[in-house]
Amino acid sequence: MAMNKDKPWTLYLLAVGLAVLAAVQFGLFSQPAVQAIPYSQFLQLLDQQKVSDLHIEHERILGRLQEPIDGHSVFSTVRVDPALSEQLGRSGVAFSGVVEDNTVATVMGALMPLLMLLALWYFLFHGLGQKQGLGGLMGVGKSRARVYVEHDTQVTFADVAGIDDVKGELTEIVSFLKNKAWYARLGAHVPKGTLLVGPPGTGKTLVAKAIAGEAAVPFFSISGSEFVEMFVGVGAARVRDLFDQARQAAPCIIFIDELDALGKMRGVGSFGGNDEKEQTLNQLLAELDGFDPREGVVLLAATNRPEVLDPALLRAGRFDRQILIDRPDRKGRLAILKVHLHKIIYKNDLDCERIAEITPGLTGADLANLVNEAAIVATRRSSQWVELQDFTAAVERLVAGIERKGSVLRSDERQVVAYHEMGHALAASSLPAMDPVHKVSIIPRAAGSLGYTLQRPTDDRYLISTQMLRDRLVVLMAGRAAEHLVFGQVSTGAADDLGRATDIARQLVTRFGMSPVLGQAVLERQQAGYLGDSLLRQERKDYSEQTAREIDLAVRGLLEEAYGRARALLEQRRDDLDAGARLLLAKETITPEEFPALQPQANEPATYVLVDATK
């Protein structure tokens, strides 16, 4: 701490010194105004005894007058007469002479550029480095891990909800850190490394902090991207320093977040023969082999891209254990909601079970954001507490985007959108395999949609049948089918529906083996690439041109079948379609309670006719 307090004074003194040197170098010291006079005038002043004192240099004379002339009391002139001293003596004028010495000025002129460069180097590599926590140029090889102790993490297993099945695995790590002797009596030791795998936002970092908080041990937290800097060898040096610090603080936990930034498969995407990231990874592998798990150092790491990690990093003896932290189920979402609800003021009869039901697929981070959004919605309407309607509005905002109530559609466009959305809603309510309809709206959203039909599942699904996929195609095609049925033509409003339907149909044929024509072969596989998520999913096609043609025909057949089913269903329910569209135009948003025809009912026609909607 003393060093930190002295740093401002050090920088202050350095700045003052530089200012002084600059003043000397560039002559910034102020001097009195000097009047240059001819040597003959100087001799006259000397004879008239108007000169008080003189300073004689090698080539010039500086003097001061007894009385100022023209506002100047100091004068200078060129030294001409070598016998000047005799005349000065006769006149009784005191004078002095010096031999001009330019040694100091010469030396300072030579050193000034060097001193300026040294000062610039100091500020760049020391002052800036301290602000960024680098410790200066000499400290670039030091670990940048943030160290927490028990009271710093402020997180325990009580703050981690929705992953009860994972807590059992993690409790073993806490038990080892608290009681190593109990495991050592049978020769057991904790796994060297534990890899937390899961989608973003599922709580991997929170779990690591909870382990440290439960075990009450130091917690070294660092991101995988913080190891590599612009200097070669810095990453490897930081890995060594991190493990050295951990050994000194044992028992402790090292947590490396975003391990894929550091442990990416070697040779993939490397354009140099000796890549800096590979050096850092090699040093990490060496440290994992070198430290003894009985020392009490536990290594935790987290990633959402395990497929790109180097196989050498995942072998036994390094990361021995992988723990999947997946999206929570309904029970898990309920537990997570209860944790975050303590941070807001909500109505006592708030139905948390209902909120958990309408939020399938949301992660812990999503649910935390949902609770905050609901509180914002309640504040916006000046409510005293947060209610279920606020959570419903927050879910719609997350799913469909922000309402654009200022957008004004033409009357004919609103009518097309109303029939389009009612077509989706009636198709979903007529097919038992589909999720029930919760709300239909023709209010434009920021996500780019002019309307939306919101369906909410009643439970989590882990398997999807062929019938469910085919029915989903019917719901997607029903919007365009309604437009064609009512107006005799179609619009561009179904572009997104057609794209999603085509993707489902293609996966049904090529990935799921559900095509009666092509059989149960998997024709396309997804491979992991090196570049980001947009290019991460690369399709590998293992089929001939003839098979490609058959795939295209099969996909087209599925879409035509779905469109025919949707058209037949809406023809049978034409009265409901017209009534629902009129109500939607009047109210803009309706629910099954306001329009009972949206309640689930299995009444799909047994037969249908294929219709060409492009004409």
UniProtKB/Swiss-Prot annotation:
Keyword Cell wall biogenesis/degradation (UniProt): no
Record-annotated active site: 421
Membrane topology: Multi-pass membrane protein
Record topological domains on the Cytoplasmic side: 1-8, 126-615
Names of required cofactors: Zn(2+)
Record text on cofactor binding: Binds 1 zinc ion per subunit.
Main localisation: membrane
EC number(s) given by UniProt: 3.4.24.-
One Gene Ontology term, aspect cellular component: plasma membrane
Transmembrane segments: 9-29, 105-125
GO biological process annotation, one example: protein catabolic process
Residues on Periplasmic side: 30-104
Binding site for Zn(2+): 420, 424, 497
Chain positions recorded as ATP binding sites: 198-205
Protease recorded as keyword: yes
Family matches, as InterPro entries: AAA+_ATPase, AAA_lid_3, ATPase_AAA_core, ATPase_AAA_CS, FtsH, P-loop_NTPase, Pept_M41_FtsH_extracell, Peptidase_M41
Subcellular location: Cell inner membrane
Top-rank taxon, per record: Bacteria
GO terms, molecular function: ATP binding; ATP hydrolysis activity; ATP-dependent peptidase activity; metalloendopeptidase activity; zinc ion binding
Biological role: Acts as a processive, ATP-dependent zinc metallopeptidase for both cytoplasmic and membrane proteins. Plays a role in the quality control of integral membrane proteins.
NCBIfam families noted in UniProt: FtsH_fam
Assembly behavior: Homohexamer.
Family: In the central section; belongs to the AAA ATPase family. In the C-terminal section; belongs to the peptidase M41 family.
This protein's name: ATP-dependent zinc metalloprotease FtsH
